Every structure is written in structure tokens, then in C-alpha cells.
Amino acid sequence: MIDRVRLPLTVKVLIALADLKGKVGNSARRKLLRRLRKRSLLDFEQRLATLGPRDVCIDLGANMGVVTEKLAATGAEVHAYEPDPYCFDLLTKRFADKENVHLHNQAVSATAGSLLLQRTRDFEIDPEIQSQSSSIIRSNDAIYDPEKSIKVEVVAFNDVIRDLHRYVALIKMDIEGSEFEILDCILDDYANGCVLPIGALFIETHERHMPNRFDLVKSVRKATWSGLLPYRIDTYWP
């Protein structure tokens, strides 16, 4: 177990109000999101300061490599996963001289296999921006063009962790919907007595696009704040 997360009284009040319906609940959720996103970024920077060459980090959904760059600057061994070939080509050039950065042209989800990576209809207009929305999960969203989808390899999250044979100090996860399946997997494993060698996870969750997953995110947040999980899972990564 980890220590309980100490939340300011104002945040605790907003958490309680966020469960309400109507304008009060909507307002509380917006305020809570703003506050805890700032807190998430601060916590991330503080954890970066503790990393060094002996540590291992993972960037899931590396995209253009902004976070990968920050992780690599600590001297830690960084494994960056990015399924989109456009982004991966840029990552390959950006980190060509970084011996501590290992790039993987794969998507990560709960199970291994192959899936179609959906690209937006406007991908060619501005691929650097549009690639941030590429997803192997959100196929029914109107912003995607089925004709622009590409087949990508998917590796299982648990395999990624176990194949390293190392403790993973920090994971950043921004994978456009696949995070829910991974969270399900993490919680199921823990319920069955399996604790992965992980320190902290910073996850951007996309329940606004998948409302049926809101309860999962809510339960993960409460479990983390209460110190009931062996990992620090921050689901307010912006």
C-alpha cells in the first residue's frame, strides 16, 4: 500500500459536489479538473527530479516525444511506445543520439494482437496536431475516417512491464481510450494478488468520450486517494 493522498479541504468539497447533477455538479467538476491537473503536473515534475540513470520509465503514447524528452533528460532508461508511423519517424530522428531512449513502434493495451489505428479526417492538414487523437479504441467517433485507418501491432501492458525485469519508477500514459482496458487489468491483477513492479502512473483519461467508463475512473481515484492501491495512479494528467 501507499500513503493516503492529502487533499486540501477545498478539493474535498469539490469532489463531494462533483457527484451532484445539474449546474452545481458540472461547475464542481470543471473546477476540480483545473485544480488537479495543475497538481498532476507539479507532482510529475517533482518525481522527475528524483529520477536518475538507475531508473526505468515508460512513455505510452509518446506522440512527438515531449514527455519522452523530459524523462530522458534525467538519465533514466526510457521506453517510448508510439504506434503511428508518422510520429514514430519523427521520434526516431529526434532521439537518434539518445542511447537511453528505446523506441517501440507499437500500441499498448490490455491484450496483444493487431488493431486498426484510427486517424482523424483532417490528419493530412496538420498531422502533428491530429495525431494526438489517433486511437485504436474510439473507432465510432465522427472525427475519424475509416479509410485512413492503419493496421498496427498491439502489445500487452503486463508483458511490457514483465519483459523489462526491472522496477518501473514512472509511467506516462496518453493512449486515447486504451487506458481503460489497462486500468481494468491492473485492478483485476491486484484483486488476484498480483502486484506489478510499478511506482507512479500519470494517465490522461478520456471518459468524456466514453461515458460508460466514468465509474471506473471514479473508483480508481478514490482507491488512490485512500491509499488502497500499491501504486500512485494519477488520472488527472492533462
What do the predicted segments below correspond to?
Residues 2-238:
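Phosphate/nucleotide-binding beta-alpha loop and adjacent structural elements of enzyme active sites
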